[in-house]
Swiss-Prot record:
HAMAP family for this protein: CsrA
Family: Belongs to the CsrA/RsmA family.
Name of the protein in question: Translational regulator CsrA
GO annotation, cellular component aspect: cytosol
Keyword annotations of the record: Activator, Cytoplasm, Repressor, RNA-binding, Translation regulation
Chain's role: A key translational regulator that binds mRNA to regulate translation initiation and/or mRNA stability. Mediates global changes in gene expression, shifting from rapid growth to stress survival by linking envelope stress, the stringent response and the catabolite repression systems. Usually binds in the 5'-UTR; binding at or near the Shine-Dalgarno sequence prevents ribosome-binding, repressing translation, binding elsewhere in the 5'-UTR can activate translation and/or stabilize the mRNA. Its function is antagonized by small RNA(s).
Top-level taxon in the UniProt lineage: Bacteria
Pfam families cross-referenced by the UniProt entry: CsrA
Listed InterPro entries: CsrA, CsrA_sf
Chief site of localization: cytoplasm
Amino acid sequence: MLILTRRVGETLIIGDNISITVLGVKGNQVRIGVNAPKEISVHREEIYQRIQTEKKTQTQ
């Protein structure tokens, strides 16, 4: 796992077309903004896991 440090307002670039910007930090919460092409899905981990579980349930 690559670990990077960013301050509010700073951005990470992934590949040629995805950027992640730190929008704010309040207590133990970090607000981030993600810019990605529409064909790339972006989900919180718990939502992604729910989607995967539903897909497995539908194929059974």
